[in-house]
Amino acid sequence: MKKIIMLKSLIITSFFISLVLFSGCNSAEEVSANTDSKSSAQTQINQIMIPLSEITEKAKWYDYEVDNKTISYFAVKASDGRIKVAFDACDVCYPEKKGYRQLGSDMVCNNCGLKFAIGGIGTENKASGGCWPGYLPVIIEGDYLKISKQNLEKSKWRF
């Protein structure tokens, strides 16, 4: 009789422990907020999603953590309304780890001082071998800017 009561107690306890452990799991479709002090970017399994409403003509910086590295990038709306995104690291000056700052309608390299019109960034380096905000491919879909985590991770060497 004691064995049956113990077995029932064990089964019930296991059931409740399972409920507690698995109730916090999200499905692959669910989006969870990645709340850091810089952004309200959201993350899914393979991509980062930034609400378009969050991107203005004032540059906003975002961080992505991987392999003990912080990959930093920024998003800004150009004067023509197009969204521009780039790594916060230059193709040449990245070893200095100084990134960019916004000065009016330009992004300025904090290392060498070169200025880049916001409307022109978000592409591959136009001056091969020179300073340029690192290219980060993005997709705009619905109300979100989407960034592949794989594209972020491919450029972790800059950071």
Regions inferred by a protein language model and the residue ranges of each:
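N-terminal pre-ligand scaffold of iron-sulfur
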Residues: 31-102, 135-159
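Short cysteine/histidine-rich metal-coordination sites, predominantly Zn2+-binding motifs
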Residues: 104-112, 123-135
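Iron-sulfur (Fe-S) cluster-binding segments and ferredoxin-like electron-carrier domains
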Residues: 96-103, 114-123
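Bacterial signal peptide processing site
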Residues: 26-28
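Sec-dependent N-terminal signal peptides
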Residues: 10-18
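Processing junctions and N-termini across compartments
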Residues: 19, 84-87, 103-106, 125
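C-terminal motif of bacterial Sec signal peptides marking the signal peptidase cleavage site
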Residues: 21-24
